[in-house]
């Protein structure tokens, strides 16, 4: 169990006047417990939950298929198991709420996640419970990482960055996007990642597309190649993107990359505690705008247990940065026929900003032979 996170959650419940909070989404279950129930993210009816009470008791709830995993990872926990296909998911959960003495209580639940039919069944089974939305509570807590989380993200960011470097070093003109995909996934696991998400391999004219996977297209001289992947470790994600050029870059590619490096350095200077997310984006646009290409609506976003989290550094919304935030920052050009992107993982420190994905030197485009 993640004691630091439980303590943060208890303080948040006291401020919100909640008697308990239920972490039911895969990301928030992992936030409380420190581990992912393996099949929950892909078979989302296989409910798992961590119930945290205001007096810091924690009880777990999981489907029978995952009982051995949960019991092995939390052998001392109060764990309730429900049987898949027997229709008893919510009755078992309601019994857990009763046994914790929470009837008549105000309980926070992720109303954005739990299916409406299941929440309605809970309301019928334990009608004297007041169910309150808790998604925003978790979002606010997860924005500020603990020192342990920051170090975890540092490890994962280096794994991901290093895997991309390994992959580019293994290919040359004539290699295919599939070759590059195989190389980066192999390197991720070899370096210690447990999984990956959203693998983007886009070369030549396909580099203009934001989120495409690999094809059998062969790399050609002059191609720009965008390679982005989110390495995963203990439920946390680190998204890194590097752009390579095959053998010889164009003058325009070099011009854009020189601007990206200046944007990178500017962001490293202005990302700091107390800074406004909107002001950061506007300062970024002053430099990026010299290129003459249309920007996307943000240059950065929170990252951690989900691929995109708050805060966003963009034209919508307003956040004040705080130490402990971990962000993905990404100048990107997606133009007609080509694209370039430079994405790093950074953390807001007490003094300013620190890059966590620091394996690759990014002053120049990666060269592929």
Predicted ranges, named:
Residues 1-369:
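Active-site neighborhoods and metal-handling regions in enzymes and metal-associated proteins
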């Amino acid at each position: 169990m993640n004691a630091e996170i439980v303590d943060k959650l208890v303080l948040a419940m006291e401020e919100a006047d909640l008697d308990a909070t239920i972490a039911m989404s895969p990301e928030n279950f992992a936030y409380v417990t420190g581990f992912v129930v393996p099949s929950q993210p892909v078979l989302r009816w296989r409910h798992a939950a961590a119930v945290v009470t205001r007096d810091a008791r924690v009880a777990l709830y999981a489907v029978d298929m995952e009982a051995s995993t949960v019991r092995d990872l939390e052998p001392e926990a109060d764990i309730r198991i429900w049987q898949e296909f027997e229709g008893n998911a919510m009755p078992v959960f309601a019994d857990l709420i009763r046994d914790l003495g929470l009837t008549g209580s105000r309980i926070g639940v992720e109303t954005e996640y739990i299916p409406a039919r299941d929440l309605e069944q809970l309301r019928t089974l334990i009608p004297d419970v007041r169910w309150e939305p808790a998604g925003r509570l978790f979002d606010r807590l997860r924005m500020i990482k603990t020192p342990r989380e920051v170090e975890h993200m540092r490890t994962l960011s280096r794994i991901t960055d290093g895997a991309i470097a390994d992959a580019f070093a293994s290919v040359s003109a004539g290699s295919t996007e599939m070759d590059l995909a195989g190389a980066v996934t192999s390197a991720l696991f070899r370096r210690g990642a447990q999984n990956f998400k959203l693998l983007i391999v886009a070369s030549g004219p396909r580099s203009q597309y934001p989120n495409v996977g690999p094809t059998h297209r062969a790399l050609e001289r002059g191609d720009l190649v965008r390679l982005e992947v989110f390495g995963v470790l203990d439920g946390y994600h680190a998204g890194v993107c590097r752009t390579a050029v095959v053998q010889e870059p164009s003058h325009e590619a070099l011009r854009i990359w020189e601007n990206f490096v200046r944007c990178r350095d500017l962001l490293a200077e202005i990302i700091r505690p107390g800074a406004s997310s909107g002001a950061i984006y506007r300062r970024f646009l002053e430099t990026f705008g010299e290129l003459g290409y249309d920007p996307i609506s943000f240059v950065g976003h929170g990252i951690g247990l989900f691929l995109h989290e708050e805060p966003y550094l963009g034209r919508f919304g307003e956040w004040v940065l705080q130490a402990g935030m971990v962000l993905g920052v990404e100048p990107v050009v997606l133009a007609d026929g080509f694209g370039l992107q430079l994405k790093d993982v950074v953390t807001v420190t007490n003094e300013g900003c620190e890059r966590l994905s620091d394996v690759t030197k990014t002053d120049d485009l990666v060269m592929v032979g």
